[in-house]
Every structure is written in structure tokens, then in C-alpha cells.
């Protein structure tokens, strides 16, 4: 399975729901989606079940740029925290 992106504009910004897997090859398209979104961005990871290290580093960068990450699985959240502390 590849990455599916569902984008929803809302009053206070944009919610981008990600479904499937996030790999290095997906990051270019995902970055483009973020650049085309409203200033307040939420990434919904509820349906993400697999990521690679490049995806984790991307998510660390997103949080540093004030992108909110919702519905993140525990293993992804812990990996983000470990990567951030490096």
C-alpha cells in the first residue's frame, strides 16, 4: 500500500489526513501539500501504520514548524521523540 492524502480546508486551517504508509519517496508530494495549505496545518496520522526513518525526520521538522500532529500511534510518537532528542 502507498500513501493516500486527503486534504480538508476548515475555518481555522487545513487538516491533511494521511492513510497507509509514509516512505522517503512520498515526502516530496507531502511537502508540496503542506506548502499549498493554510498557515494552520494539522496532520492526521490515525490511519498510518508504517513509516521509515526519513518520514520520522520529516514529522520532527513539521512539529518544529508548528504543524500539529494528531492521532499518532504510540510507536510513531516514541520514535519522533527519540529522533528529536538526537
Positions of predicted regions on the chain:
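Amphipathic alpha-helical interaction surfaces in cytosolic regulatory modules
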Residues: 18-86
Amino acid at each position: 500500500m502507498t500513501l493516500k492524502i486527503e486534504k480538508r480546508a476548515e475555518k481555522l486551517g487545513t487538516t491533511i489526513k494521511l492513510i497507509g504508509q509514509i516512505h522517503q519517496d512520498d515526502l516530496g508530494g507531502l511537502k508540496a501539500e503542506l506548502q499549498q495549505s493554510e498557515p494552520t496545518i494539522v496532520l492526521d496520522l490515525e490511519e498510518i501504520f508504517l513509516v521509515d526513518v526519513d518520514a520520522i525526520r520529516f514529522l520532527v521538522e513539521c512539529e518544529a514548524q508548528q504543524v500539529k500532529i494528531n492521532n499518532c500511534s504510540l510507536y510513531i510518537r516514541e520514535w519522533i521523540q527519540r529522533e528529536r532528542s538526537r
